[in-house]
């Protein structure tokens, strides 16, 4: 089936297996209930997927809805990391209609897998009932600004306030949460201000630098030139001259922030478990793609 719904080209496609062995540093398996993502983030690395899927449409304007054989033996994934949403957002707006992510979670109940859900949506609160049944599950929201205008320039996902509210609701339901400050835009992202907003409702606070490569490098550089002209020299130093001093200074700032708030500070690690409220583990993912082979998610 193929149709256009609210300007998005929707196709329903068959896939032999929804579970894919992952090359991600945190993954045993990557699971993407959809192909494409209608958040249309300007900096999204996943737009490279078009090379493999054959889509000619602009990234963010299409979505393939996958149909897969039911997972008959979820115990097969016991102890494995399962990342939901590595190159899509399982809670894109179309999830309300198609329900693929909810169906996936239902099939993973009893798996004893270590599940990580990556999203920019507040729709995840719909599935709190299932998240509670899954045991080891973590929900991560990407939040790299408190400025809704900048957010709207970058993506069409849920508002920052809605993401923060969803994080609070999921956290209070007893589910481990992550605030993923990704990507950190030089001169724009104030990660300490974000930390102060979310520290009482997240267990982990990840920091990742903005990577610029491929087609979206020009998009972002042109945006900075048009909207933040004073930052052009900084972006030129970082992304054309490969000067790392800015992010090296941010690492120092993040470590000082950890001491200030009595939080653990770890380098390219993903600790497990819950932490005392108000003291999330701060995870330094700056330049981690060189160590572990990934980019902004």
Regions found by a protein language model. Give the residues of each.
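Active-site beta-loop-alpha junctions enriched in small/polar residues
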Residues: 87-89, 120-122, 142-146, 182-184, ...
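Conserved strand-turn element in the central/C-terminal portion of the radical SAM core barrel
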Residues: 156, 168-189, 240-244
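Short acidic/glycine-rich loop or secondary-structure boundary segments that cap or lie
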Residues: 149-150, 187-190, 214-216
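Auxiliary Fe-S-binding modules of radical SAM enzymes
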Residues: 2-14, 192-297
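Glycine-enriched alpha-helix->loop->beta-strand junction motifs that scaffold or abut catalytic
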Residues: 133-139, 199-204
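Conserved Radical SAM active-site core
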Residues: 1-138, 146-150, 160-161, 165, ...
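Hydrophobic faces of well-ordered beta-strands that scaffold small-molecule active sites
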Residues: 29, 82, 115, 139-141, ...
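Anion (oxyanion) recognition and catalysis
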Residues: 109, 171-172, 199, 259
């Amino acid at each position: 089936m193929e149709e256009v719904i609210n300007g998005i080209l929707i196709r329903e496609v068959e896939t032999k297996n929804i579970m894919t062995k992952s090359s991600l540093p945190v993954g045993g398996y990557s699971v993407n209930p959809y192909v494409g993502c209608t958040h249309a983030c300007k900096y999204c690395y996943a737009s490279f997927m078009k090379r493999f899927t054959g889509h000619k449409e602009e990234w963010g304007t299409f979505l393939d809805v996958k149909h897969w054989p039911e997972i008959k033996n979820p115990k097969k994934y016991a102890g494995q990391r399962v990342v939901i949403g590595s190159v899509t957002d399982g809670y894109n707006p179309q999830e309300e209609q198609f329900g693929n992510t909810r169906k996936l979670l239902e099939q993973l109940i009893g798996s004893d897998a270590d599940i990580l859900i990556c999203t920019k949506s507040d729709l995840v609160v719909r599935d709190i009932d299932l998240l509670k049944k899954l045991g080891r599950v973590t929900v991560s929201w990407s939040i790299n600004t408190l400025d809704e205008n900048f957010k709207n320039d970058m993506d069409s996902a849920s508002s920052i306030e809605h993401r923060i509210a969803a994080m609070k609701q999921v956290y209070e339901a007893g589910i481990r949460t992550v605030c993923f400050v990704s990507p950190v835009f030089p001169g724009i992202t104030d990660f300490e201000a974000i930390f102060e907003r979310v520290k009482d409702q997240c267990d982990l606070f990840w920091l990742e630098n903005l990577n610029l490569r491929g087609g979206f490098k020009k998009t972002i550089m042109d945006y900075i030139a048009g909207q933040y002209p004073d930052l052009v020299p900084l972006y030129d130093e970082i992304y054309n001259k490969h000067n790392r001093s800015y992010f090296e200074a941010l690492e120092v700032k993040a470590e000082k922030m950890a001491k200030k708030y009595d939080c653990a500070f770890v380098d390219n690690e993903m600790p497990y478990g819950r932490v005392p409220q108000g003291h999330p583990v701060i995870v330094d993912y700056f330049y981690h793609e060189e160590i572990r082979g990934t980019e902004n998610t």
